[in-house]
Every structure is written in C-alpha cells, then in structure tokens.
From Swiss-Prot:
Family: Belongs to the globin family.
Function text: This is a tadpole (larval) alpha chain.
GO cellular component, one term: hemoglobin complex
Modified residues (N-acetylserine): S1
GO process annotations (BP): hydrogen peroxide catabolic process
Keywords (A to Z) from UniProt: Acetylation, Heme, Iron, Metal-binding, Oxygen transport, Transport
Record note on quaternary structure: Heterotetramer of two alpha chains and two beta chains.
Expression sites (tissue/organ): Red blood cells.
Gene3D superfamilies: Globins
Binding site for heme b: H87
Species classification: Eukaryota, Metazoa, Chordata, Craniata, Vertebrata
Pfam hit, one: Globin
Globin domain ranges (all copies): 1-141
Protein's recorded name: Hemoglobin subunit alpha-3
Length: 141
C-alpha cells in the first residue's frame, strides 16, 4: 500500500491533470504503440493515428480511471473491480502489457509536469501504477 506522503504525491499530479486527461492518455497510447508495436493487436478497430478520436476517447478513459483509482487509494480492488473483470475475461489483455503502459504514463507525466514530477513523485506513481496493474491482473488464471 501507499504511505500518506506517496498518496499525496499521486494526488498532486492527478490534480494537475484536470481536463487534459484525453490528450495525455492519447499521447500515452501513441507512445505505447510506437515503443511496443505488439500492443496494437488489442485495438484492431481503432484509428491509431496520433490524436485520433479513438485514441483521445480511450486515452481519456485510461487517465480518468487512474484518477478515480487515485481518489480511492484505500480500496483500489473495489474501485477497479469492473475494469479487472473486463481486462481478464473479455479483453484478455496480456498482463505483461500493464507495466509497459505504466512506464509510458510516467514518461508522459514527466514530460508535461517536469517541475512537479520529481523523483519522489515518480517513485510514488511507479508504486501506484504497480498496485493498479496488480488489481487489473488479479482475476487472471
């Protein structure tokens, strides 16, 4: 679990994201697909052009889900239960992809919030995203 200072660090960045969720999420997906092209296979019906409506919509869902999770740090499993079901049973996303996206999200946050995304904040986000990944993959068999 996260310490009080780690929770505050995660929430400090969530507070800065504000209405930029779709743009940040779209950028994260674009970087993911460029860096790890094998991840494109989960999105055969998407327009993967950078800045596309599909990437903006799905990217926004990802960032908003993370913001929601950040506001429920004491019950991540409960907050993310439906997403865990979706990824494990319907989408069947390879669990190895979650750390890839977690890394990319940190790159995007560091790029957009360089003065705020300090080493301590990055460490808290790394831990937070690892906890989210663990919840999302908890229902895999």
């Amino acid at each position: 679990s996260l310490s009080a200072s780690e929770k505050a660090a995660v929430l400090s960045i969530v507070g800065k994201i504000g209405s930029q969720g779709s743009a940040l999420g779209s950028e994260a997906l674009t970087r993911l697909f460029l860096s790890f092209p094998q991840t494109k296979t989960y999105f055969p019906h998407f327009d993967l052009t950078p800045g596309s409506a599909d990437l903006n919509t799905h990217g926004g869902k990802i960032i908003n889900a993370l913001a929601g999770a950040a506001n429920h740090l004491d019950d991540l499993a409960g907050n993310l239960s439906s997403l865990s079901d979706l990824h494990a049973y319907n989408l069947r996303v390879d669990p190895g992809n979650f750390p890839l996206l977690a890394h990319i999200i940190q790159v995007v946050l560091a790029t957009h919030f360089p003065g705020d995304f300090t080493a301590e904040v990055q460490a808290a986000w790394d831990k937070f995203l690892a906890l989210v990944s663990a919840v999302l993959t908890s229902k895999y068999r």
